[in-house]
Structure formats: structure tokens, C-alpha cells
């Protein structure tokens, strides 16, 4: 069994100061995918310790973005080159091939999609990234190798994924054009092959496990009573191809017990894979 946790840490050093380390020690995680690391590799090594093997892709601007995958086993291969050099994708995509303790191949992809802002160059950059991501997703989906794409994808695919979806129809994160990319990766919710992982598509593990329910959410604003009232967004995902999705034994969003015990505005998304 491999337990994989993905979380946007909003700066890994700050997260550890606020209580991430006790959570990690108690989590039983074998593979840890972090987004918005905002730190150097040396910082990760110092915080995580010698038990972890780390693959890290830093952003081109210091103190921005950054993704990392840490595992308890060695890496067979690491890939960070993503898309044309004319597009700055640094700090947003890293792939790691490992062999699980049971001797099975596994590819873990960690992704941090731009937050965007409707009608601005930030949104243009988000679409540019999503286009490149879609091409790579098709390549990954064409392989039978067990593969999962995790991370903060900064889009709610369906109305079930956002508490206040009607008020966000014109906002980045729930724009029709953004959600259409998820239709390509997972299938449209009204299609017969939705979320089955057929035809090179992926399975939204969270939706597969929880079914047609609102949420459960993975992000809540720090402002107001959003966390206490569970006014959240489900924008953090495990997207597994069919061979891997068939091995899922457990999935949960590890929501903090209270506002003051949070160490990020995102909650870890954890899945167990029998592989």
C-alpha cells in the first residue's frame, strides 16, 4: 500500500512553523506532494529530514510557486521539463517515477496551476499552462503505467466542487473555459464515460469515492467565517488513470479540527493505493 498526500502549503517554512511537522509525523504518508513550496531544496531537506528523497522544481522567481515530491523510496526518474521554453512553467510541474515497496511501477505528477484572474494577463497565463498540461495529460493517459496527477489545480470542475458556485460563474477558478479542460481529462458529467478513466482519460478519485455530494472541500479563505461555515472550494485533486484508480482503498481530505489549528488555507488530500 502506498499512501499519497498532496497539499498546497503556502510556503513550507511557514507551514512547519504553524504545525505541519506533527501532522506529517502522524500521517503515515509514503509520498508527499507539495505545492507553493516557496523555498530552496536545502530548506526542504532540513525540514523533512533524511528519511525522504526529494524532487524539487523551484519557480523562476524566488519566493513564488515551487513544487516538490518527497518519497520514502528512491526515484527511478525525475522530469521537470514541461512544454515549450517560451512558456514559464518553472515551479509548477514535476514528475517522478518510482518502484513501490511491493515492486510495482508508479508515476506521480505534482502540479500547481495558476490562480488566474478573469480578463487579465494572469488568466491568459493560466490558459496557456492548461493547454500545455492537456497535451501532457494525453501522453500520460496513453500509457498503461499506473499514474496519478495530484496538486492544486485551481479549478472547481463542477458545481458540487464550490459552495457558492452561482456567485463565482464569472470568476477565475469556475469559468466555463477552465472547466472544459477537466471535461477533456475526466469527461463531461453528462457523458456515459464520465470519470471512468476510459479512452486515455483520468479518474477524479475524490468524486469517485464520495459520489454526487457537495464537496468535500479542500480550500477555504482565511477571511471571515469561511472555514467555520465550510464555505470552501474543492480545487485539490488526485487524478488517477484507470489502472491506478482501480487500486484505491481510501481517500480523504484531512481538514483541520479548528480554524486556529490550520497550517495552510488548503487541507491535505490523501489517498491509499494498493500497489
Describe the residue ranges of each PLM region.
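N-terminal, active-site-proximal structural segment of metallo-dependent hydrolase catalytic domains
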Residues: 1-49, 53-55, 59-67, 185, ...
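Short Gly/Pro-enriched turn/cap motifs at secondary-structure boundaries
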Residues: 57-60, 84-86, 226-230, 259-262
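Structured beta-strand-rich core segments of catalytic domains in phosphoester-bond hydrolases
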Residues: 38, 43-116
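Surface-exposed cleft-lining segments at the edges of enzyme active sites
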Residues: 83-84, 113-130, 167-172
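Surface polyanion/phosphate-binding segment centered on an Asp-His-Pro turn
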Residues: 252-275
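Active-site beta-strand/loop signature of hydrolases that rely on acidic residues for catalysis
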Residues: 4-9, 20-42, 108, 136-159, ...
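Conserved beta strand-loop-helix elements of the APE1-like EEP
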Residues: 62-78, 214, 228-247, 273
Amino acid at each position: 500500500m502506498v499512501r499519497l498526500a498532496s497539499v498546497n502549503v503556502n510556503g513550507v517554512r511557514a507551514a512547519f512553523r504553524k504545525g505541519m511537522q506533527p501532522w506529517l509525523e502522524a500521517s503515515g504518508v509514503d509520498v508527499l506532494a507539495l505545492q507553493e513550496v516557496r523555498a530552496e531544496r536545502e530548506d526542504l531537506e532540513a525540514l523533512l529530514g533524511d528519511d525522504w528523497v526529494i524532487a524539487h522544481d523551484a519557480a523562476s522567481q524566488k519566493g513564488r510557486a515551487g513544487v516538490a515530491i518527497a518519497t520514502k523510496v528512491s526515484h527511478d526518474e525525475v522530469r521537470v521539463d514541461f512544454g515549450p521554453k517560451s512558456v514559464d512553467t518553472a515551479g509548477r510541474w514535476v514528475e517522478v517515477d518510482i518502484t513501490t515497496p511491493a515492486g510495482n511501477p508508479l508515476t506521480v505528477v505534482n502540479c500547481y496551476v495558476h490562480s488566474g484572474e478573469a480578463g487579465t494577463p494572469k488568466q491568459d497565463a493560466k490558459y496557456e499552462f492548461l493547454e500545455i498540461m492537456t497535451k501532457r495529460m494525453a501522453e500520460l493517459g496513453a500509457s498503461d503505467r499506473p499514474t496519478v496527477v495530484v496538486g492544486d489545480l485551481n479549478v472547481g470542475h463542477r458545481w458540487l466542487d464550490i459552495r457558492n458556485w452561482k456567485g463565482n460563474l464569472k470568476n477565475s477558478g469556475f469559468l466555463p473555459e477552465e472547466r472544459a479542460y477537466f471535461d477533456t481529462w475526466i469527461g463531461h458529467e453528462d457523458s456515459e464515460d464520465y470519470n471512468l478513466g476510459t479512452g486515455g482519460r483520468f479518474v477524479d478519485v475524490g468524486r469517485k469515492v464520495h459520489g454526487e455530494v457537495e464537496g468535500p472541500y479542500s480550500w477555504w479563505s482565511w477571511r471571515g467565517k469561511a472555514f467555520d461555515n465550510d464555505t470552501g472550494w474543492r480545487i485539490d485533486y488526485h487524478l488517477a488513470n484507470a489502472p491506478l484508480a482501480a487500486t484505491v482503498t481510501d481517500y480523504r481530505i484531512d481538514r483541520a479540527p479548528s480554524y486556529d489549528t490550520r497550517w495552510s488555507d488548503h487541507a491535505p488530500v490523501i489517498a491509499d493505493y494498493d500497489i
